[in-house]
Amino acid sequence: MDLLKFKKNKLHINNIKLEYILKKRQTPFYLYSLNQIRKNIKQIKSSFKKFDPLICYAIKANSNLSILKELRKNNLGADVVSLGELKLALKAGIKPNKIVFSGVGKTDEEIKFAIKKNILSINA
């Protein structure tokens, strides 16, 4: 299935007419394709399956809680760079042993919280 497609000169996203979507939402808004997200996850996991890696999604790329929950359902981890992102990953249900705390300039509070939650690693 194509994500974007014209049918009878009308743009469709996931086979839904864009005009219909626009009638249901105020603009501007973000529109995500859950089908495409799942397809991307499957492709990435398939590409690396022989190595059995922990694939961590960088929460700074998109912190939408619904998307993060979908990542959790697909057994992905999280790469976080702040206390807020760490709390969001945990709120999404991502297991602490699948959370990597990257970035520089971590506060004592952030480090203590990460240790208390027993996350996988804290990178300096």
Placement of each model-derived feature along the sequence:
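A charged N-terminal "starter" segment
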Residues: M1-S121
